[in-house]
């Protein structure tokens, strides 16, 4: 977002002084400060405060007669000793009550008003951190307050420190602001009680000095005086609120008296006089508030110092809440709207929090419509792209309050809902909370339309639809909203290909599933996996000719895309229940803890015993739809299969693995084959299934090898043209052989050499983007075959063959990295090369304890390999920066073109590209570390990436290079 402050137009009228200036032109709060303490606390670009407009005639002074023969001379040298002020000392003494301080001052004022006023002004100067004092000569001439303060300022500029009570970290000022606020509250209260607020000039005398100080070019004086004025205005607002309440009570009493059959004239006159006095006092307070708003707030709300701006905006929020009859109007709200574009994070955050309170106040809603239409676009922008995460989160909460008031259109609500896919977890979680509230309100409206919940359940209980749950309405609404969100981001072939690569290991959580995991934590209804499972399996949507049943069933009938989201909701529900409800203690120190662990294991076994039949039924139901079948298989990814120990689970597993075998051998969808492969690997961790699974996998591999030889045995794979029909067959066959090589050691197969040779020939084909998926499978299969190679301890005579086969694969990979037009295929070749090297070195380290043996062959990272890898990484960093819309930081000095793939600028693509860059960076740094080739130049290259591509990549670089 742009962090400059834009000038708001004044729709409500007002003079130039009431319009905000452009902060980016007038000041920079984040600019570096001078080494001089006086320059630190001096602002040359401040806006001078105008004097208060209201001045009453001054009565004769009471107290000691003083000769006014000379003005107080301000010395230029700093006094050697700290000037003592009893009020300041009392304020710092935590044992002295602030009310006692206020009462004591008024007692002094009654004895000698001029000395008391001078003492109070000196107290304010002490609060500013100013070791200067005025005397009664200065107090007597109020019109010269500004000139006197200017002399004081000139004398202290050279000696002033950056530290003053309001911002000091000194322990003696720990509760300074809190006690100062209490003192000012008691001070205003005593002014009102003693009638000085309405019938004396004492308040104006004090405020004339405070207003003058608020325009000081010295930051400590200006800040402290502004805080004084703002707090006094706050307590004037409270007093005004009390008067308004008294006026309302007196008015009711008067009306009641006038309606009596026997009118009491004395009582009526008394009430009229009371009302007149209240109105007079209220008018006085309103005049004070207007005067000090114009003379202090209008100038200080856009002060160069962010802390002053924050104080102004916070207090404005308090004033509006306290006396809306005075401050709740567009002419005051506009100041908050203008400051939504402030360059300072804290200021923007303060405004958002203040506004949220207004939108959550029912009595304010009607008066906020114009403000919303004028500033909601800016608030939505802050939610989506503000530079600070805290501001974004607070803005989303404000958007939710505005939505509740009915001030957001559907298209604007969708903008916020799209943030559930944001890359930042805090923003994502807050957006999911927003989503849950939208769903709840929509569902409540529908249930009210169809009748109460009890009425709906009673209607369904009279039918054969016994599995129905009213929660289905909520699940349906969630799926429909998420469909709208997901379809608002146009997917692309490149995105789908990248996603398929990183979903291969089964641990990659889709953005929708991640959002639903947050929803499960926010609302426990989404953890009802049994209700969701029954909903997934429900098929009876035929009309019953009864309302509201038909209307509800029609609403709950989902399309394939929505069903896919429902399956992801079920996956999130299962994962939440498995992870959150069954936490085994890390250590068991006693019998009771051991019994608790056993009970938890039994509960988990019971959960799996109930859950597996549902999953088997769901996979069988969705076997005809590749997308839904893939989502169904992913349900098992959410479960820790190693914890399934109950013997009763065996029959469910038997059905499951037979279904997986059928899906693996008969389905040509790549994701289905990959999903089955992952599940076979995970099921192998269950001891009771090992033998049966081994036989089943052997049978699958035998059939797959036969299929491979049939398709590729006599086919000229390197040069022949592949037709569309052949491509479909080859793609499925290669994906199956890829899965089989992950499951079983193929090094003993007699067909090993021909499989290896055919795959190498396939990688040597002329680049053709249409055939990329074939090469993806070939690369992955060769990686698995090399892994089995590395695990074997062959005779020395076989070492040459292994090196030759390894060299062939590496040459194919480097050829793809340097020459292939497909950037994603280049990425996969680079990842495979790095993973193979890491795997090889790990196997060697486990086979040989002699470190010298491992380090003998650290020649695998040849310069041409490293150059190719760095260019590929730099290309993806460029793409990440482009999609993420942040500056690109070069990694190499190469002039080769950067990676260009078809990805829109949206959170989905940004999240995926972050994953790509972090994955590639970590693997590259591991390989460079293993090769002992980290040079100072190389370290410098990667160190410069820190801070440019997000915290995750920076953490990876720090871990390896620090």
From Swiss-Prot:
Alphabetical UniProt keywords: Cell cycle, Cell division, Centromere, Chromosome, Chromosome partition, Coiled coil, Mitosis, Nucleus
Source species, domain of life: Eukaryota
Region (Disordered) residue spans: 1-72
InterPro entries cross-referenced by the UniProt entry: ARM-like (IPR011989), ARM-type_fold (IPR016024), Cohesin_Scc3/SA (IPR039662), HEAT_SCC3-SA (IPR056396), SCD (IPR020839), STAG (IPR013721)
Biological process, per Gene Ontology: cell division; chromatin looping; chromosome segregation; meiotic sister chromatid cohesion, centromeric; mitotic sister chromatid cohesion; mitotic sister chromatid cohesion, centromeric; sister chromatid cohesion
Subcellular location: Nucleus; Chromosome, Centromere
Subunit structure: Cohesin complexes are composed of the psm1/smc1 and psm3/smc3 heterodimer attached via their hinge domain, rad21/scc1 which link them, and psc3/scc3, which interacts with rad21. Interacts with swi6. The interaction with swi6 may contribute to recruit cohesin complex to heterochromatin.
Similarity comment text for this entry: Belongs to the SCC3 family.
The name this protein goes by in its record: Cohesin subunit psc3
Organism: Schizosaccharomyces pombe (strain 972 / ATCC 24843) (Fission yeast)
């Amino acid at each position: 977002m742009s962090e400059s402050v834009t000038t708001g137009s004044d729709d409500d009228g007002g003079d130039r002084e009431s319009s905000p200036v452009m902060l980016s032109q007038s000041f920079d709060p984040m600019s570096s400060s001078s080494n001089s303490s006086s320059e630190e606390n001096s602002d040359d670009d401040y806006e001078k405060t105008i004097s208060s407009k209201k001045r009453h005639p001054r009565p004769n002074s009471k107290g000691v007669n003083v000769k006014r023969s000379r003005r107080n001379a301000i010395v230029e040298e700093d006094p050697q000793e700290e000037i003592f002020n009893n009020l300041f000392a009392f304020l710092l003494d935590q044992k002295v009550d602030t009310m006692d301080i206020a009462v004591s001052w008024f007692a002094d004022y009654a004895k000698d008003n001029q000395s008391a006023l001078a003492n109070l002004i000196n107290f304010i100067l002490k609060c500013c951190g100013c070791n200067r004092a005025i005397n009664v000569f200065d107090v007597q001439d109020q019109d010269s307050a500004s000139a006197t303060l200017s002399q004081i300022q000139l004398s202290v500029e050279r000696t002033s420190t950056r530290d003053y009570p309001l911002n000091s970290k000194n322990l003696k000022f720990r509760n300074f602001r809190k006690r100062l606020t209490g003192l000012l509250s008691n001070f205003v209260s005593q002014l009102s009680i003693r009638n000085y607020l309405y019938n004396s000039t004492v308040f104006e005398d004090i405020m004339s000095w405070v207003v003058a100080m608020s325009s000081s070019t010295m930051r400590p004086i200006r800040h402290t005086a502004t805080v004084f004025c703002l707090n006094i205005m706050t307590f004037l607002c409270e007093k005004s609120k009390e008067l308004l309440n008294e006026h309302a009570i007196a008015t009711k009493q008067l009306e009641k008296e006038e309606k009596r059959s026997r009118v009491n004239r004395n009582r009526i006159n008394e009430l009229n006089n009371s009302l007149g006095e209240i109105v007079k006092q209220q008018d006085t307070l309103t005049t004070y508030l207007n005067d000090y708003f114009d003379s202090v707030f209008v100038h200080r709300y856009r002060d160069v110092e962010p802390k002053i701006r924050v104080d102004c905006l916070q207090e404005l929020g308090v004033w509006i809440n306290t006396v809306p009859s005075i401050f709740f109007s567009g002419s005051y709200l506009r100041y908050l709207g203008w400051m939504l574009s402030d360059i300072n994070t804290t200021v923007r955050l303060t405004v958002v929090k203040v506004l949220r309170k207004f939108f959550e106040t029912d009595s304010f809603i009607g008066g906020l419509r114009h403000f919303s239409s004028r500033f909601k676009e800016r608030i939505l922008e802050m939610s989506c792209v503000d530079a600070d995460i805290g501001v974004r989160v607070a803005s989303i909460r404000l958007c939710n309050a505005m939505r509740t008031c009915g001030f957001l259109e559907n298209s604007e609500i969708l903008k916020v809902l799209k943030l559930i896919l944001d890359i930042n977890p805090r923003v994502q979680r807050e957006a999911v909370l927003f989503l849950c509230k939208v769903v709840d309100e929509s569902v409540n409206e529908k249930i009210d339309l169809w009748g109460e919940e009890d009425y709906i359940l009673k209607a369904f209980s009279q039918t054969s639809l016994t599995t129905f749950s009213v929660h289905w309405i909520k699940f349906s609404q969630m799926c429909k909203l998420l469909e709208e969100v997901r379809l608002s981001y146009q997917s692309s072939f490149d995105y789908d290909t990248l996603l398929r690569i990183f979903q291969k290991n089964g641990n990659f959580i889709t953005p929708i599933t991640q959002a639903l995991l947050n929803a499960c934590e926010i609302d426990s209804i989404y953890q009802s996996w049994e209700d969701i499972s029954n909903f997934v399996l429900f098929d009876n949507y035929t009309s019953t000719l009864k309302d509201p049943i038909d209307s509800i069933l029609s609403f709950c009938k989902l399309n394939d895309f929505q069903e896919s989201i429902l399956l992801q909701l079920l996956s999130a529900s299962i994962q939440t229940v498995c992870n959150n409800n069954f936490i085994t203690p890390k250590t068991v120190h006693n019998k009771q803890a051991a019994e608790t662990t056993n009970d938890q294991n039994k509960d988990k076994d019971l959960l799996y015993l109930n859950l597996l039949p549902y999953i088997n039924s769901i996979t069988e139901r969705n076997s005809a739809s590749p997308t839904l079948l893939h989502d169904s298989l992913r349900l098992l990814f959410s479960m820790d299969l190693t914890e399934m120990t109950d013997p009763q689970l065996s029959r469910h597993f038997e059905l499951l693995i037979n279904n997986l075998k059928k899906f693996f051998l008969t389905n040509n969808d790549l994701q289905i084959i990959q999903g089955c492969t992952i599940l076979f690997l995970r099921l192998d961790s269950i001891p009771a299934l090992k033998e049966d699974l081994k036989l089943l996998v052997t049978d699958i591999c035998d059939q797959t090898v036969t299929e491979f030889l049939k398709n590729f045995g006599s086919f000229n794979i390197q040069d022949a043209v592949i037709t569309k029909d052949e491509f479909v067959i080859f793609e499925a066959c290669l994906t199956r052989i890829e899965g089989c090589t992950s499951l079983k050691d193929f090094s003993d197969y007699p067909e090993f050499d021909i499989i290896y040779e055919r795959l190498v020939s396939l990688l040597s084909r002329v680049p053709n983007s249409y055939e990329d998926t074939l090469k993806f499978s070939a690369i992955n299969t060769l990686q698995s075959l090399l892994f089995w190679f590395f695990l074997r301890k062959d005779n020395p005579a076989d070492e040459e063959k292994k090196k030759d086969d390894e060299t062939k694969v590496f040459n194919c990979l480097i050829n793809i990295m340097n020459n292939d037009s497909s950037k994603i295929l280049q990425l996969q070749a680079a990842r495979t090369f790095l993973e193979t090297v890491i795997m090889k070195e790990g196997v060697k380290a486990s086979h040989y304890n002699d470190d010298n043996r491992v380090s003998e062959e650290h020649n695998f990272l040849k310069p041409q390999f490293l150059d190719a890898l760095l260019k590929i990484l730099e290309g993806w960093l460029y793409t990440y920066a482009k999609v993420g819309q942040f500056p690109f930081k070069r990694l190499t000095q190469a002039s080769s073109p950067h990676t260009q793939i078809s990805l829109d600028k949206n959170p989905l693509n940004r999240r995926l590209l972050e994953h790509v860059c972090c994955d590639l960076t970590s693997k590259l740094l591991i390989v460079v570390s293993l090769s002992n080739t980290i040079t100072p130049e190389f370290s410098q290259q990667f160190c410069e990436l820190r801070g440019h591509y997000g915290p995750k990549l920076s953490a990876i670089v720090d871990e390896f290079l620090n």
